[in-house]
From Swiss-Prot:
Signal peptide range in chain numbering: none
GO biological process per UniProt: maturation of SSU-rRNA
Matching Gene3D superfamilies: 3.30.300.20
Assembly notes: Monomer. Binds 30S ribosomal subunits, but not 50S ribosomal subunits or 70S ribosomes.
Function in brief: One of several proteins that assist in the late maturation steps of the functional core of the 30S ribosomal subunit. Associates with free 30S ribosomal subunits (but not with 30S subunits that are part of 70S ribosomes or polysomes). Required for efficient processing of 16S rRNA. May interact with the 5'-terminal helix region of 16S rRNA.
Gene Ontology annotations for the cellular component aspect, listed alphabetically: cytosol
Organism: Lactobacillus acidophilus (strain ATCC 700396 / NCK56 / N2 / NCFM)
GO molecular function, one term: ribosomal small subunit binding
Protein name: Ribosome-binding factor A
Entry similarity comment: Belongs to the RbfA family.
Classification lineage: Bacteria, Bacillati, Bacillota, Bacilli, Lactobacillales
Entry keyword set: Cytoplasm, Ribosome biogenesis
Subcellular locations according to the entry: Cytoplasm
Keyword Cytoplasm (UniProt): yes
């Protein structure tokens, strides 16, 4: 069963990315990138993780509202392409791992800069 869930998760990720780029015309969602999908074992719910390039709290709220508004349309379009009996209910959550990764990169760059300054003294 786990293999099937993983296959469906990959299919949902691929199809939602296409739907977001081609079919959803909401300007609030132009900077959204879907990073991962996790389905329950019975495939009744799919948690969709997304990332943004901005750290603006107001923009994050607008994007979440846009995703919630487009959820029904996305689920309908998914139903036309997925090979499952019932299309999972979509739940959108912000993926902070990209933001966390860029913070780590900045900290590493800062440490390297400090090391270079110490070495030159």
């Amino acid at each position: 069963m786990k293999h099937r869930v993983g296959r469906v998760e990959g299919e949902i990720l691929r199809e939602l990315t296409k739907i977001l780029r081609k079919d959803i015309r909401d300007p609030r969602l132009s900077e959204v990138t879907i990073t991962a999908v996790e389905c329950t074992n019975d495939l009744s719910y799919a948690t969709i993780y997304y990332s943004l390039l901005t750290e603006d709290a107001e923009k994050e709220k607008e994007v979440q509202e846009g995703l919630d508004k487009a959820k029904g349309m996305m689920r309908h379009l998914l139903g036309q392409t997925l090979t499952v009996y019932k299309v999972p209910e979509l739940i959108f959550k912000r993926d902070n791992s990209v933001k966390y990764g860029s913070k780590i990169d900045r900290l590493i760059a800062e440490v390297k800069k400090q090391d270079a300054e110490r070495a030159s003294k």
